[in-house]
């Protein structure tokens, strides 16, 4: 599929549900110590994503955009500021952003010149690794806002997400010292349209938060099933079921209608399953 190298904000707004948006904002800073960086962050993308956050991205970014962080996507070497990882290592990083080959990626920046320098650098990086459906958002986030595009100001957008996600934090069923009362949990599930007797498949990143929600759901009379592999397994074995275009989570479910409720990190996916009548 051929795509335009440069796309206008109005087009992005109109095609928002069919693209994967990446924020390539980067704040200039002195080059990191090579030995220290390699010891702490080299090919340790989870650590980097937890510790090397960009304040501009956290303050404001396009709704649903993940941050393509130059301080993580590349590494410093003796003679290069932004050294390229191997294709396998790079793929491991961008999968954490919910990016898979075949997605139409739209990359934007901010600040001077609309952030086109950083966005273009990210563009050519993806092209180097064989990603062909990549575009740059002309004018960056400021132009997007002028086109009535939606932005958000929080730090929970990174990571893999499902289409039409509805957040259901573990805090809906757990308090600081343990599970909430059954009546409170009943109300929390009911608020999401999940009632006694419904069958749900519950999953999260690695199965921890989902286990607690699954237990609370079972206590509330819901037929709760835990998907052990979680988003982590899906990212490697069935990435087509992730990243804004999810239509089915489990291959065996062929005659069921699924509504997805996704959570990031300490959140979980609850999939309400109803038989088609």
Curated annotation (Swiss-Prot):
The active site is at 204 (cysteine persulfide intermediate). It catalyses: thiosulfate + hydrogen cyanide = thiocyanate + sulfite + 2 H(+). GO terms for cellular component: mitochondrion. InterPro entries: Rhodanese-like_dom (IPR001763), Rhodanese-like_dom_sf (IPR036873), TST/MPST-like (IPR045078). Residues 15-153, 155-243 form the Rhodanese domain. It holds the Pfam family Rhodanese. GO terms for molecular function: 3-mercaptopyruvate sulfurtransferase activity; thiosulfate-cyanide sulfurtransferase activity. Induction: Expression increased by knockdown of mpst-1. Keywords: Repeat, Transferase. Its EC number is 2.8.1.1. PANTHER family: SULFURTRANSFERASE (PTHR11364:SF27), THIOSULFATE SULFERTANSFERASE (PTHR11364). Contains two rhodanese domains with different primary structures but with near identical secondary structure conformations suggesting a common evolutionary origin. Only the C-terminal rhodanese domain contains the catalytic cysteine residue. This is Putative thiosulfate sulfurtransferase mpst-4. The lineage of its organism: Eukaryota, Metazoa, Ecdysozoa, Nematoda, Chromadorea.
């Amino acid at each position: 599929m051929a795509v335009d190298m440069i796309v206008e904000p109005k087009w992005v707004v109109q095609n928002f549900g069919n693209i994967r948006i990446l924020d390539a904002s980067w704040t200039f800073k002195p080059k990191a110590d090579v030995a220290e960086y390699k010891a702490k962050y080299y090919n340790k993308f989870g650590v980097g994503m937890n510790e090397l956050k960009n304040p501009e991205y956290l303050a404001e970014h396009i709704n649903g955009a993940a941050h393509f962080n130059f301080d993580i996507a590349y590494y410093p070497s003796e003679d290069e500021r932004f050294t390229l990882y191997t294709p396998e290592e790079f793929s491991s990083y961008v999968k954490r952003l919910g990016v898979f080959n075949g997605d139409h990626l739209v990359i934007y920046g901010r600040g001077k010149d609309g952030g086109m320098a950083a966005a273009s650098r990210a563009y050519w990086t993806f092209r180097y690794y064989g990603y062909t459906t990549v575009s740059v958002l002309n004018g960056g986030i400021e132009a997007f806002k002028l086109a009535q595009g939606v932005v958000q100001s929080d730090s929970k957008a990174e990571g893999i997400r499902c289409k039409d996600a509805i957040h259901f934090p573990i805090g809906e069923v757990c308090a600081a010292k343990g599970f909430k009362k059954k009546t409170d949990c009943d109300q929390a599930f009911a608020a999401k349209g999940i009632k006694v007797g419904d069958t749900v498949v519950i999953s999260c990143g690695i199965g921890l938060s989902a286990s607690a929600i699954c237990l609370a759901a079972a206590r509330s009379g819901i037929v709760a099933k835990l998907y052990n592999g979680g988003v982590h397994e899906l990212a490697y074995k069935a990435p087509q079921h992730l990243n804004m275009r999810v239509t089915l989570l489990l291959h065996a479910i062929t005659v069921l209608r699924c509504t997805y409720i996704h959570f990031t990190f300490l959140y979980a996916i609850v999939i309400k399953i109803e038989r088609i009548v």
